[in-house]
Amino acid sequence: MSDQEAKPSAEDLGDKKEGEYIKLKVIGQDSSEIHFKVKMTTHLKKLKESYCQRQGVPMNSLRFLFEGQRITDNHTPKELGMEEEDVIEVYQEQTGGHSTV
């Protein structure tokens, strides 16, 4: 009945095997681009770790933003509504904010 009507919407994503993966661009402050192919259900912690490893910097020294929203380790592309060729911006983490005069 109504339960059966609600099911197809959840299954629609599984119909296309190509839809399981998307390509994302990660752009650093120096305008360097690294492209990643990730599953829609993969935690973005993996992408962040891979990016930091390639750049040779600790993960806690950078922050990753998608459409102005900070990406947490547990976010997935699906949760954030990411699509093919979307851009993730990377910035140097800044702490503090007051002078030490």
From Swiss-Prot:
UniProt superkingdom: Eukaryota
Main location: nucleus
A single GO molecular function term of this UniProt record: transcription factor binding
Domain Ubiquitin-like: 20-97
Signal peptide positions on this chain: none
Subcellular location: Nucleus membrane; Nucleus speckle; Cytoplasm; Nucleus, PML body
Glycyl lysine isopeptide (Gly-Lys) (interchain with K-? in acceptor proteins) crosslink site(s): 97
Function: Ubiquitin-like protein that can be covalently attached to proteins as a monomer or a lysine-linked polymer. Covalent attachment via an isopeptide bond to its substrates requires prior activation by the E1 complex SAE1-SAE2 and linkage to the E2 enzyme UBE2I. This post-translational modification on lysine residues of proteins plays a crucial role in a number of cellular processes such as nuclear transport, DNA replication and repair, mitosis and signal transduction.
Protein family: Belongs to the ubiquitin family. SUMO subfamily.
Assembly, per entry: Interacts with SAE2, UBE2I, RANBP2, PIAS1 and PIAS2. Covalently attached to a number of proteins.
Protein name as annotated: Small ubiquitin-related modifier 1
